[in-house]
């Protein structure tokens, strides 16, 4: 686990974040997954945090995120879910709307947990093995 030095503080903050497709419909194809990961990486870069691990199953996504104390979790997740939903619905709308109605890609809720240096490797492996279950 990497320790970062800021002006007047030192930190190491990581979160395991999970959210699901609306109605848990299995709509995340390989093509959608690849584009989703591109979009999320750009959002993280634009907002000054890092996605250390990212993997999906057909109906949900797992992220391991590294951020600073200035990042507010609800704002990070709002940006990740909101921008990705808008862009994916724009690019894959015809395909997605077959299973999703009302124009919503993501379920409004999410899971977030802090990650310690003792659990980081376990979380990484868990995320990496999502499709292998």
Q: Which residue stretches match the model-derived regions?
A:
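Basic nucleic-acid-binding interfaces
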Residues: 1-133
């Amino acid at each position: 686990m990497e320790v970062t030095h800021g002006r007047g503080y030192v930190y190491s903050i990581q979160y395991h974040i999970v959210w699901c497709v609306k109605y848990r419909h299995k709509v995340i194809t390989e093509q959608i997954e690849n584009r989703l990961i591109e979009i999320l990486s750009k959002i993280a870069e634009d907002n000054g945090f890092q996605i250390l691990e990212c993997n999906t199953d057909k109906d949900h996504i797992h992220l391991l995120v590294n951020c600073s104390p200035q990042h507010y979790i609800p704002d990070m997740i709002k940006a990740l879910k909101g921008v990705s939903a808008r862009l994916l619905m724009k690019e894959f709308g015809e395909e997605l709307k077959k299973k999703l109605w009302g124009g919503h890609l993501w379920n409004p809720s999410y899971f977030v947990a802090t990650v310690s240096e003792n659990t980081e490797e376990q979380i990484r492996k868990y995320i990496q093995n999502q499709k292998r279950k």
